[in-house]
Amino acid sequence: MRTNFARLAMLAMALMLVLSACGSAPAATQAPAVATEAPAMTEAPAATAAPAATEVPAATAAPADSGMQIPEVVDGKTNVAMVLIGPHDDGGWSQAHYEGLLYVEKNVPNVHVTYIENVPEGADSEQVFRSLARKGFNVIFGTSFGYMDPMEAVAAEFPDSTFIHISGYKTNGTNFGNLFGAMEDMKYLAGMVAGSRAKTDGNPKLGYMATFPIPEELRLGNAFILGARKTCPDCTMDVRWINTWHDPIAEKDGAASLFDAGADVVLTGADTPAVADVAQEKGKWGITYDYIGSCKVERCLTTIYWNWGPIYTKVINAIVDGSYKPGFDYFDADSGSLGLFGFMDGQTMTKGTADLPAEDIKMVKDTLAQMLAGKFTRFDVFKGPIKDNKGNVVLAAGVSLEQLDLDQFKEWNPDVKIGMYWWAEGVTAELPKLSQ
């Protein structure tokens, strides 16, 4: 799930150590509150339980230039820090990463883990990354698109620390790597579910509540409508831009706007389950994102979720044994780190999904099985023939987008051949204006 926009927080910061109810969770440092917020397996990944109690080091004052306190490292251990854009218990993006960190604490030998939450993108985050590196953290994860440039800058200053950026598209090949997953796989499947629901309800209008106009959001929105039109060829999709990753009020307002404009099903690209709560109030349907536990109300069709623990464990173990090579690591559904709730092994479909036409459910399951087997990837999601919503041919029959097309806009990078600055056929919204 993230993009660099204007600072949204006050300069005052406070320290908070968060302890898990079933043990001692990673130490957490509280950054300023902000209104913001970047993977299938045969067995469904379950929400990760907190590890057995371990010692949590007390946080100490950060260097004067950071304006906040930074946790201490533990001598003799592999020290891992994670920087979160939102609160660790947001019910979405940040909570999925936090539970991945708990998995690491339980499964990586001799590791010390900690996290800092609510860190704004931009200059504030650069100070946090620099302070963590100065403290001596061996591995530092940054979990928002807008941390990309700050992490790149700090990585150049601290060659003995390894920086892993989630989402984005930059790497230095030495100590700054990139990690993300093809959530377009799952959003394509979620589109099939949404299209089937809309068709069954007799209302072929869908909605997508998008965050920021970055390639990730257009990629995921396009995957959703492409999937929807497999089960509902007449379906259309409206879009609302809320310009935040994490703001429950803005998310509720955006969802309500789409429902009030006629949408039967709305998918969110933001962090919290707000879209499902609004769907419950209005008797419509919502699809949540990021976290396996976010689909709780009756009017939630499904959620597309990440299972970060195994991926994080693999990366940290590789760093420790010296085999990690910083680069661009982009995984598909066969990694075991992406899920579609209700369709993975051992899971039960929601009420709103279970009564859909049998042929549509079969299409979703068959496509998912191909994804899990590695036979259907992100390049199959974006394989022609595909037209944009103006009737122009984006991809001829049999032609797929390349990775660079998925990651960037042609308007931002002249090396991109096609890019993602287009809406697929069926989208009724105009393209967003791009910031430079």
Pin down the residues of each PLM region.
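A residue-level marker of the well-folded mature domains of exported/periplasmic proteins
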Residues: 26-27, 32-436
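Bacterial N-terminal signal peptides that target proteins for export
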Residues: 1-9
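C-terminal motif of bacterial Sec signal peptides marking the signal peptidase cleavage site
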Residues: 16-21
